[in-house]
Amino acid sequence: MAFWAGGSPSVVDYFPSEDFYRCGYCKNESGSRSNGMWAHSMTVQDYQDLIDRGWRRSGKYVYKPVMNQTCCPQYTIRCRPLQFQPSKSHKKVLKKMLKFLAKGEVPKGSCEDEPMDSTMDDAVAGDFALINKLDIQCDLKTLSDDVKESLQSEGKNSKKEEPHELLQSQDSVGEKLGSGEPSHSVKVHTVPKPGKGADLSKPPCRKAKEIRKERKRLKLMQQNPAGELEGFQAQGHPPSLFPPKAKSNQPKSLEDLIFESLPENASHKLEVRLVPASFEDPEFKSSFSQSFSLYVKYQVAIHQDLPDECGKTEFTRFLCSSPLEAETPPNGPDCGYGSFHQQYWLDGKIIAVGVIDILPNYVSSVYLYYDPDYSFLSLGVYSALREIAFTRQLHEKTSQLSYYYMGFYIHSCPKMKYKGQYRPSDLLCPETYVWVPIEQCLPSLENSKYCRFNQDPEAVDEDRSTEPDRLQVFHKRAIMPYGVYKKQQKDPSEEAAVLQYASLVGQKCSERMLLFRN
């Protein structure tokens, strides 16, 4: 039996893959394949669990490549920020930014940037054509009202109904369902009051206890760089994120390089603002026009899109509209969980926007667009490093938030392999859904596009669907377990679709999320 103590449940419409379509990576006209679902509403926990099973969102569309069939297998990749050390090339980018801010220096020669992958140029493109045909953005108000009415009715009739026929409800669920248009969003991200929340322009403070742990860690490293340090961490002492100020023989940390003080007469000022992706937020609304213009400029210059292909409808659908319900739990980060735009303001003008999701365990990179006039600053790399540092900063307040999700890694695509340079990082096994260090995966990927990374032949998907009858369905204005729903169905293809959905989302999500069936 499912309970939604946190508020509204996730509500999704599932569409199994039927055809192959054009691949945005290798340009194969009929090589890409994925399954997808339209998320009317989704909790941050459900989306995080879906990420851990190889799913990814683009706007409100959530998709999962058919890994053993698609031409360019897309492996979920995450970086471990707590252990991250910037490489020489990363340091070069950060120093280049500091020189530009301090003295206005512009590097000579061209610079190839490494932006996070475009969720609009990949496998999603083919599936959106299907979604438009199916008119998935149907009468969502009716759906919301139906769910609310079903749950209210269940509350009144709970004594009369059999316990297995309907599930316990929350009266507010209908009010909190995400609508098809972001401007109608009901649930608004809470904006931290002045003086609260993470200050993105400054490194976080350190506690005396953390400083003592750091001293002990350094002492152990000097005595035994491998064994004793591992024992120290195994006792529950994480490695310090912000070590003492670097000495001449100690490399600077990521934070030292990002937040290095600038002279009072610096040539430029860079400010990073975290803005909830909601039209109910005044800062998001006031900066929308400038942000949209930047997006068009980026798409035309970098991806060679036609201006007509970069309308406000497309921009809003992909980068502003999100199914994620904002949450601000007391033990979470001050900014809360949900979808955000991380805006980079240079001298009062937006030059880059990183679209991110903040989840219980992850900061997830969705998309980046920037002003091509500032390509010499390598804003793709710079923003990724800032997001890694931001994850470390959030970890100081919320200890479980300790991973940076970089989307998909495609070994067969040269433009996507750069993600493997943010070490340490892990790839998700497409069969058992366990994380495996990327170093262990690369040899296999050199021999085959599709690989099972888990080397244990006996290992299985621990969250595989074992009790499909417990899957939750919303059908004919009622919420019911699949065991009840299937008794009303005679179409064998419907059973196949529902069981496929259950196998892809896993047992936990299948019991929490509502599968909408018309």
Swiss-Prot record:
UniProt keyword Membrane present: no
Localisation per UniProt entry: Nucleus; Cytoplasm
Biased composition (Basic and acidic residues): 149-165
Keyword set, alphabetical order: Acyltransferase, Cytoplasm, Nucleus, Phosphoprotein, Transferase, Ubl conjugation pathway
Annotated positions of the Phosphoserine modification: S169
Top-level taxon of origin: Eukaryota
Region (Disordered): 149-207
GO cellular component: cytoplasm; nucleus
Catalytic activity: an N-terminal L-alpha-aminoacyl-[protein] + L-arginyl-tRNA(Arg) = an N-terminal L-arginyl-L-aminoacyl-[protein] + tRNA(Arg) + H(+)
GO molecular function, one term: arginyl-tRNA--protein transferase activity
Keyword hit for Thylakoid: no
Pfam families linked: ATE_C, ATE_N
Main location group: nucleus
Enzyme Commission number, as recorded: 2.3.2.8
Enzyme kind, highest EC tier: transferase
Family note: Belongs to the R-transferase family.
Function: Involved in the post-translational conjugation of arginine to the N-terminal aspartate or glutamate of a protein. This arginylation is required for degradation of the protein via the ubiquitin pathway. Does not arginylate cysteine residues.
Subunit comment: Monomer. Interacts with LIAT1; LIAT1 is not a substrate of ATE1, the interaction takes place in the cytoplasm and seems to increase ATE1 arginyltransferase activity.
UniProt protein name: Arginyl-tRNA--protein transferase 1
Source organism of this protein record: Macaca fascicularis
Gene that encodes the chain: ATE1
